[in-house]
């Protein structure tokens, strides 16, 4: 069966968007609110109709991730590009550890289902929501190890709300990595199918 490179590219863009938003937060203490909303909602959408539905049914919701993906493929691995690549590969590695740990997978599903039922009690994109998602990341994902080392401004990274947002976005990145594997994504594509992925990303961006 032929791989659906459109869906693979969307899911990979989700992972890249997670990495890019973490970069922006850790260095600048700000990032695109709509893109963060897309990532948070991707966690809570546990029964999507399609891959695009995971991201709110609009390709433009992944614009930051698609551009980050092109940057990762097209630039030399130094500075910001190296950090982004490290985040992406770390998220993919955490997904593999998660899938090999049935207890952790079950716990993640249960915690997200519970939060999905409780989300009426949270203001969208509120501190409470970020703390709840961060709690899931700390309790379920972090113990899988190794932990993702986030680099940035020490002053910014000491802020508890920034810490919660970073962990929530990383949780979304793991969710996207699970999706990526489910639709046929794999690490070898990052080496051997990059031109096809680059072209697909450019095609999607052309009508975002």
Swiss-Prot record:
Membrane topology: Peripheral membrane protein
Protein's name in the database: High frequency lysogenization protein HflD homolog
Entry-linked InterPro entries: HflD, HflD-like_sf
Residues making up the signal peptide according to the UniProt record: none
Gene Ontology cellular component terms for the protein in this record: cytoplasm; plasma membrane
NCBIfam families: PRK00218.1-2 (NF001246), PRK00218.1-4 (NF001248), PRK00218.1-5 (NF001249)
Domain of life: Bacteria
Protein keywords: Cell inner membrane, Cell membrane, Cytoplasm, Membrane
Organism, as annotated: Photorhabdus laumondii subsp. laumondii (strain DSM 15139 / CIP 105565 / TT01)
């Amino acid at each position: 069966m032929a791989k659906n490179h459109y869906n693979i590219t969307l899911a990979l863009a989700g992972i890249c968007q997670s990495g890019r938003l973490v970069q922006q937060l850790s260095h600048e203490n700000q990032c695109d609110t709509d893109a963060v909303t897309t990532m948070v909602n991707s966690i809570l959408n546990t029964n999507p109709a399609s891959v695009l539905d995971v991201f709110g049914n609009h390709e433009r919701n992944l614009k930051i991730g698609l551009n980050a993906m092109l940057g990762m493929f097209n630039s030399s691995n130094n500075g910001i590009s190296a950090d982004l690549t490290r985040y992406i590969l770390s998220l993919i590695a955490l997904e593999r550890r998660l899938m090999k740990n049935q207890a952790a997978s079950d716990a993640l599903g249960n915690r997200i289902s519970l939060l999905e039922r409780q989300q009426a009690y949270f203001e969208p994109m509120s501190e409470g929501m970020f703390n709840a998602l961060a709690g899931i990341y700390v309790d379920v994902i972090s113990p899988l190890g190794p932990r993702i080392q986030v680099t940035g401004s020490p002053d910014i990274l000491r802020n508890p709300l920034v810490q919660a947002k970073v962990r929530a976005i990383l949780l979304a990145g793991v969710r996207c990595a699970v999706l990526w594997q489910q639709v046929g994504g794999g690490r070898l594509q990052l080496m051997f199918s990059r031109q096809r992925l680059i072209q697909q990303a450019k095609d999607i961006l052309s009508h975002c």
